[in-house]
Amino acid sequence: MIETDKLATEQRIIAATPASSHEEVFERALRPRQLDDYVGQEKVRGQLEIFIEAAKRRSEPLDHVLLFGPPGLGKTTLAHIIAREMGVNLRQTSGPVLERAGDLAALLTNLEANDVLFIDEIHRLSPVVEEILYPALEDYQIDIMIGEGPAARSVKLDLQPFTLVGATTRAGMLTNPLRDRFGIVARLEFYDADQLSRIVRRSASLLNAQIDPNGALEIAKRSRGTPRIANRLLRRVRDFAEVKADGQITAAVADAALAMLDVDPVGFDLMDRKLLEAILYKFDGGPVGIDNLAAAIGEERDTIEDVLEPYLIQQGFLQRTPRGRVATLLTYRHFGLSVPDARRPERDEWDTPDGK
């Protein structure tokens, strides 16, 4: 039972991580190529415009950049845009791939002047690789060992000036020495429905899909604030529209397609509803401990904490308390339930005694 649910969770259509290598290829085709085409993240985009222009005027590499935030918000896209705006090459890798110091040294020594090195999941770098990275970031030099045993000696190699762009969904897992070496740190936030609607319309035009503004907005509202999910839903709605609606994506067509996919009006799927319904119906709205909740829905604790809960908490449908998980007023309303009187004081704990 648990294995089946794990498989279902990994294949969720509203998952923020790429579903397959095929989807990654599809994403690359839809990526904006310039900052002017990048939708949303206005603060980050404005900062990068200034920093990139200043670096180009001085003919210097851009300061090292750390991009962090939930998956699917455009960190990889921004890394590609940074390289393109700087007019340099981009080399891409990920933290888990760099297992040995030699792996990183090979990448660094092949960089040309002012190139961008993009390391995804940078929080997963091994300590050995991190140690090599520190002098490379500060002094554009690396120390490598030549030979073995008593004959081994350290050789210092000079590197071309370069920019490291690191991306992570877990900035708290970065070591302080590594974090301190980034001159530019930017957090990517969830998108609102209007921004996602613009992304959906742009992607639809690239896919030659016919979509009206209301159809784009309907997809956007169910995309959980994440462009990757919006583009995935657009592909599935396009399939539905071509078979059932002469290819035209309207609000009604999008609603019918997403209902078929079990994605409700706020972007919840079966797994989200299963978790919330368990709290409401099996545990009277909570509080319930994470282990009891995991047993009740046949999921692993890590899956609940890392995959299911973050969006529910961010949207205000779930609370973590010292006593366990608790359903909020929004959850009761979403399922059309009246709120038990015993629950009201917990939800209104900041109100004054007279209710004002």
Curated annotation (Swiss-Prot):
An example Gene Ontology molecular-function term: four-way junction DNA binding
Enzyme Commission designation: 3.6.4.-
Keyword Ribonucleoprotein recorded: no
Protein location: Cytoplasm
SS bonds (residue pairs): none
Annotated stretches, region: Small ATPAse domain (RuvB-S): 192-262
Keywords, in A-Z order: ATP-binding, Cytoplasm, DNA damage, DNA recombination, DNA repair, DNA-binding, Hydrolase, Nucleotide-binding
One BP annotation, GO: DNA recombination
Record bears the keyword Nucleotide-binding: yes
Broadest EC class assigned to this enzyme: hydrolase
Reactions performed catalytically: ATP + H2O = ADP + phosphate + H(+)
UniProt-annotated binding residues for ATP: L30, R31, G72, K75, T76, T77, E138, D139, Y140, R181, Y191, R228
Amino-acid positions noted as binding Mg(2+) in the UniProt annotation, renumbered to this chain: T76
Pfam families the record matches: AAA_lid_4 (PF17864), RuvB_C (PF05491), RuvB_N (PF05496)
Gene Ontology CC: cytoplasm; Holliday junction resolvase complex
Domain of life of the source: Bacteria
Amino acids binding DNA: R301, R320, R325
Region Head domain (RuvB-H), annotated ranges: 265-356
Residue segments, region Large ATPase domain (RuvB-L): 4-191
NCBIfam families assigned: PRK00080.1, ruvB
Family of this protein: Belongs to the RuvB family.
Function: The RuvA-RuvB-RuvC complex processes Holliday junction (HJ) DNA during genetic recombination and DNA repair, while the RuvA-RuvB complex plays an important role in the rescue of blocked DNA replication forks via replication fork reversal (RFR). RuvA specifically binds to HJ cruciform DNA, conferring on it an open structure. The RuvB hexamer acts as an ATP-dependent pump, pulling dsDNA into and through the RuvAB complex. RuvB forms 2 homohexamers on either side of HJ DNA bound by 1 or 2 RuvA tetramers; 4 subunits per hexamer contact DNA at a time.
Quaternary data: Homohexamer. Forms an RuvA(8)-RuvB(12)-Holliday junction (HJ) complex. HJ DNA is sandwiched between 2 RuvA tetramers; dsDNA enters through RuvA and exits via RuvB. An RuvB hexamer assembles on each DNA strand where it exits the tetramer. Each RuvB hexamer is contacted by two RuvA subunits (via domain III) on 2 adjacent RuvB subunits; this complex drives branch migration. In the full resolvosome a probable DNA-RuvA(4)-RuvB(12)-RuvC(2) complex forms which resolves the HJ.
Domain notes per entry: Has 3 domains, the large (RuvB-L) and small ATPase (RuvB-S) domains and the C-terminal head (RuvB-H) domain. The head domain binds DNA, while the ATPase domains jointly bind ATP, ADP or are empty depending on the state of the subunit in the translocation cycle. During a single DNA translocation step the structure of each domain remains the same, but their relative positions change.
The protein, known as: Holliday junction branch migration complex subunit RuvB
Species the sequence originates in: Burkholderia cenocepacia (strain ATCC BAA-245 / DSM 16553 / LMG 16656 / NCTC 13227 / J2315 / CF5610) (Burkholderia cepacia (strain J2315))
